[in-house]
Amino acid sequence: TKENYDCEDKWKFLIKSKEKDIAVTPWLNYDIICKDRNEEGGLGFMSFKNAANSQHNNGIGGQWIIQEKLSNGPFLSSMLPKRNPPLSTFRIISSSKGGLHVGQAKRNDIRALSCVWRAGRENAATDHTAILFNVHPKTGEILKGTLNTHWYHANPANKKITLSTHSYTHHPDTNKLITGMIVENIQEIMDFVEDAHYKLIPHVPLCGWDVALCGEKNEKLLLEGNFSCNFFRGTFEEMYYFEMVE
């Protein structure tokens, strides 16, 4: 239904999640301005209208979701570079069979299928240049990693197509061994995603969720749901998935 797909709007996603008591990234409620410390003549000035401010756009709110920058919790930080790593999230794909039958979806229609941890690089703004470490969805064991940075670059017709394999066992910036580490609360994280899928978008067949572990207690926070998603090279329950889409 259209209501399910409203959550593609990142602001509506946050509001609906809060209404459903789902832990998401906190936001600020006021507009902000940013000034360059040296530029003059108004050249270094930017004004951002907050989506939370209903005074903009006839009550719809502004274009920008304004949030305080979050940091990785101790568990993930122990595997990341010390110098300015980005928030390094788990990408978890969940599925729903709720659209295959008439009436309301049931909780057991929802299943989390795969998990990949995006180990961010030193001084990167986001985890889009990360090493994608496959995480076993049942045991939480972090397996080998691969790349997908070439997905975000135009590829001229005369340029050789980039292929990558699961060959990374260590973080390239620190040489720290990642493969073999255990995400001990993997089931808790997968359940967290399944609950979000059920409460927010029970009839959407597939969604990719970005989950962060933040603060001293490695608090689970949902950043967003991605409706145009893929498995990011992660292990998934193939037979269950194939039967669902058949």
PLM features per residue range, with description:
Residues 164-188, 194, 198-206, 213-246:
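C-terminal active-site "lid" helix and adjoining low-complexity regulatory extension at the edge
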Residues 1-99, 113:
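Active-site nucleotide/adenylate-binding loops and adjacent lid/helix of ATP-dependent enzymes
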Residues 32, 206-209:
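A short linear hydrophobic-aromatic micro-motif
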Residues 74, 97, 120, 198-201:
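Hydrophobic/aromatic-lined pockets within catalytic cores
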Residues 38-40, 71-72, 99, 117-122, ...:
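Short, solvent-exposed loop/turn segments at secondary-structure junctions
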Residues 32, 111, 221-223:
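Protein kinase-like catalytic core scaffold
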Residues 42-44, 74-76, 102-103, 123-125, ...:
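Short helix/loop capping segments that flank catalytic or ligand/cofactor-binding pockets
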Residues 79-191:
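ATP-dependent carboxylate/phosphate-activation module, predominantly the ATP-grasp catalytic core
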